[in-house]
Structure formats: structure tokens, C-alpha cells
Amino acid sequence: PPFSINMFFLIIIGIVLIGVIVYWIFQSPFQYPYKKIFFDISGKRKPNENDLLDHYLIQHGIQEFVDHASYVELWKKECEQKIQKSKLKNLRSKQYLECIDDEGMFLFILERKQTRYRQVNYVKHHYHVKIPVRTLATDLCHIQIRYDALKKIGFECTLSEYYAKDQRKRMTKELREKIAKRDNYTCQICGKYMPDGIGLHIDHIVPIAKGGKTVESNLQVLCSKCNGRKSNK
């Protein structure tokens, strides 16, 4: 009968509405206010995340990060006040604590541009879209440490660039000769003997770019060919 069908639909609608209301009541009203910063790494094969951050701090300073951290503290106080007034205090308190992520307050999103095409009136047109490839999360403490270190060197370059310059300065003529004698003027890969020093290179076993230091234990003799092959890897 029509009455029974109408009742059936009313019951279904009622159940759906109750479900929506229950979901609305019990879902978390808290969303952590992350600060997102986007880096375009198109054309960069293996960008160093800390270098990206250093460049950003050199150009923009640290104030926006400090301001956002202050904003997060204000947001927390407002959330705590709402929890105290809520009839679901225990649930809201749990939801609030679960969303707190101060250690990942700042999100650095690395993007690459991709070329795509669409056809309009049989003519192909290209356009670019930015595709996120990686997201890095950090806190104000990490950013402050890097900012302070950059400040000490006058913001003249990234910390890795400064470190590399410092390590290269440590490669003195005396140290070169000491390593050459230690390795008997012999390439440590192919065994070529170079007593006259022609084609002899002093190589960092762990490259400076990867944190290697200019110390005896990290240096070796290589011939020009082997050194070139190693650099190309």
C-alpha cells in the first residue's frame, strides 16, 4: 500500500538524518593550523631539504614562523576554552589532544611542474600543473637553530655551502703531501703509481657535499681517471 511505502521511506530518511547528526556531533571539530610553504624543485634531481629551508630563511627571515607559532598558541587557548564549555568535554579533550602536532607545525611541500596537454578544436595545447612529490614537517626549534647558524655567517650562503668552503680551506699543501706519501703516490682504485705527482688527486672518500670532512681518514690518492669516474657516479 502507498502508506506503507511512504512510511518505509520516512523511516529510511529518519535513519539517515540520525546518522548524519550523530556523525556531526562526534566528529572532531579541531583541525591543527599547519603553515604550508611550497618549494618548486622542478629541474632539481635531488634537492637538499635543509638547503631549501636555508635559502628561504635568507630571503624571508624567521618572523613569519615566529608569528605563526604565536597564532598556534592562541588557537590552543581558544580550543581549550571551547572544551570547558562543551557537553562532550571528555570526547572533545581527547580529539583536541590527538590533533596537536607541534613537532610538525610547518609543512614544506616540494613540488615539480609537469607539462600536460589538452585538445581544443583539433589543436593540442600544453599547460603546466604542480605535482606534490614530498612533504617535510618540522618545528620552530629546528628553524630557529638554522636561522641562528645562518645569522652567524651573515646570511652569505647556505650552511652546507659554508661548510664546504670551510672544509676546502683545510686542504693545505702540507696535508696533500702527507696523504700522497701515506698512499705511496698510488691510486687507491686502479693502483697507478704517480711519483712525479702528475695526474695525482687527493680525493674525499665521503664527499664534502654528503658531510665528509677534510681529515686524513677521509682522504685518499686517486688518479685523474678514477677521480673523474667517481665524480660522475
Model regions: which residues?
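N-terminal topogenic membrane-targeting module
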Residues: I25-L140
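Histidine-centered nuclease catalytic patch
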Residues: K192-V221, N232-K233
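Helix N-cap and loop-to-helix transition residues
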Residues: D139-H142, T172, P207, V215, ...
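Catalytic core segments in nucleotide and nucleic-acid processing enzymes
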Residues: N184, G228, N232
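N-terminal signal-anchor transmembrane alpha helix of single-pass membrane proteins
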Residues: P1-I37
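Short, charged surface segments at domain edges that flank catalytic/cofactor-binding sites
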Residues: C141-I189
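Cys/His-coordinated zinc-binding microdomains
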Residues: G191, S224-N227
